[in-house]
């Protein structure tokens, strides 16, 4: 492994006592010919996640350097993510949430080799399967990924890239796109934003092979019942992304915000949540003129 570029893996955990061991097992089983830096950050889980982590880390393979932090105070998912990224020293970067896991022992080597051999690419990802108590989701693909290049607009329009499937160049963290779109600690989501930032460095490749599992459960950050506060934060992120990238991404951003706000406005109104309904109404009024102009231009063409 001497002379090989290092790969950093960011793992965030919170209340993952039932899952974190499987996440670490998927990392430790990787067959690679390069050094690994594991950056594991537990956000002061009130359950036994910390104890499970400490016990499992005793079996760390020799080629993996562990940087484990258990925060003294709960930071929240996004500040915890920013904290973890500041620890990255590898030239490549991978992710695995504490409740997801990798299923293929050659996952990292496959993606590492691709980026080493194809310098024009900055990021690659693969297919993942859902693991869920809901039969309509369990065992099915998170999204259908093809062996081809993907565009920034594609991954923004359609939620196709799951975080645990990605390996990217860590130079992404030094791009203007990263600095401009991922500097707000109140953001609820950060995965799509960092994937888009990577595409400012180079191309993006998809692999059809399934090499990880996405655990979908009600406690997950991006899965569960309708959450109006979450949707307001999603509007905020879409605004940041649209304002930076402009063009078709900006058009889609405006459309997403309008549709989400329109639907949530009527739902909150029916539920008597008038203050929240008013917040969605402000988003609607802010974007409907832009959408009318956009639709008129499209009709003319």
Range-by-range predicted roles:
Residues 93:
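Short aromatic/hydrophobic "clamp" motif used to bind/position activated sugar donors
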Residues 15, 27, 43-44, 75:
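Conserved short acidic donor-positioning loop in nucleotide-sugar-dependent glycosyltransferases
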Residues 42-51, 73, 97:
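A conserved acidic beta->alpha catalytic loop
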């Amino acid at each position: 492994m001497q002379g090989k570029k290092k790969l950093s893996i960011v793992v965030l955990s919170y209340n993952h006592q039932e899952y974190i061991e499987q996440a670490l097992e998927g990392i430790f089983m990787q067959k690679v010919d390069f050094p690994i830096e594991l950056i594991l950050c537990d956000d002061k889980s009130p359950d036994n996640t910390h104890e499970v982590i400490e016990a499992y880390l005793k079996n760390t393979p020799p080629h993996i350097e562990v940087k484990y932090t258990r925060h003294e105070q709960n930071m929240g998912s996004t500040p915890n993510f920013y904290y973890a990224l500041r620890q990255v020293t590898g030239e490549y970067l991978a992710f695995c949430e504490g409740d997801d896991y990798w299923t293929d022992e050659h996952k990292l080597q496959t993606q590492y080799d691709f980026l080493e051999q194809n310098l024009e690419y900055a990021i690659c990802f693969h297919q993942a399967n859902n693991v869920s108590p809901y039969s309509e989701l369990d065992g099915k693909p998170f999204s259908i990924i093809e062996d081809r290049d993907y565009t920034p607009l594609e991954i923004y329009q359609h939620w196709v890239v799951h975080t645990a499937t990605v390996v990217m160049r860590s130079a992404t963290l030094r791009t203007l796109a990263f600095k401009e779109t991922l500097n707000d600690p109140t953001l609820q989501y950060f995965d799509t934003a960092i994937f888009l930032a990577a595409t400012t460095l180079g191309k993006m490749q998809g692999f059809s092979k399934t090499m990880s599992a996405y655990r979908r459960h009600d406690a997950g950050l991006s899965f569960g019942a309708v959450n109006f506060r979450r949707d307001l934060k999603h509007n905020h992120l879409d605004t940041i992304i649209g304002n930076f990238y402009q063009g078709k991404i900006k058009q889609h951003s405006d459309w997403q915000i309008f549709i989400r706000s329109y639907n949530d406005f009527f739902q909150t109104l029916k539920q008597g949540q008038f203050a929240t309904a008013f917040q969605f109404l402000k988003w609607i009024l802010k974007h409907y003129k832009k959408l009318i102009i956009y639709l008129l231009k499209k009709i003319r063409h």
